[in-house]
Amino acid sequence: ELKQYFDQLAIDGMWIDMNEASSFCTGSCGSGKPEDEVPVYPWLLGSAEPPHRKINTTDLFLVPPYAIHNLLPEISDKTIETTAVHSNGVIEYHVHNLYGYMESKATRDFLLQHRPDERPFLLSRSTFSGSGALVNHWTGDNAATWQDLHLSIASVFDFGIFGIPMVGADICGFNGNTTEELCARWIELGAFYPFSRGHNAIDMLPQELYRWDSVAEASRRALAVRYSLLPYFYTMYQHSVEVGWPVARPLVFEFPSISAVVDNDRQMLVGDSILISPALQKGAVSVDAFFPSGRWYDWYTYVEVAGSDANITLDAPLEHVNVHIRGGKIVPIQP
């Protein structure tokens, strides 16, 4: 099937989604209608016993002995039944998290065979240990809220630590209707995610970046910086492959001896040289940004900021994101 696609179109990359595996219904879904879900019986939930049967080890595959904090009530909801037995006798419970990984590997193997001279671009929602060697990732279905804008920074940090350096969140938010101000602030930050992409849920209000004048202007400014920094991003990706360091990283990675930055999840370093200090609150006109000791230079004006291991208040008008270059570093850029 993939070969048929690639024989007809020059596809640049692939996005493999819903590969947890995820489903719009629970159970066999035999009718093909999501509303016709298979009933969930109490004994499958561990809350009661079925008639004439006692609980046995099978129930552990439906109700694990530890909390996993899953979104849905039961671990088999909207996915492959965890008691399902594969053709080789393996129970789904034991291999569920490998589904996305194996799909990623199979897809990447095909792309390498089909175009051996090109590094494949693959985006996968489901990942596992080692996925960073195969695919890129986005943080899933977030919400169009100021809280999720803030949380996206820590999420990007997390996956960098997990070994997936090209990662990003849905810019402007996925679920729920965004606002002009939120979308402007999100693209100002999102332009510097390693993987930068806007995305929206079905039936939500349109949120293309050109919908509002202020968002369009914020986008032009932030994306112009990103495109200038593409050689630097590329260098950081290569460095990540060779050394293992994330592309987007918290300040504590570069300044581990400064206790004040241990829990700083409101700023983001791109590599070791570019500091992003976004506005993350509704109605903000300034941001308090932490500057480690040393020289830092405003990206736009080249004005020096003398870091002193303290916060400095920076102006943050709606269409502006604060970007600073670390003194003494070489940053390759393009026009």
Q: Where are the predicted features?
A:
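Catalytic-domain carbohydrate-binding cleft regions of carbohydrate-active enzymes
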Residues: 1-334
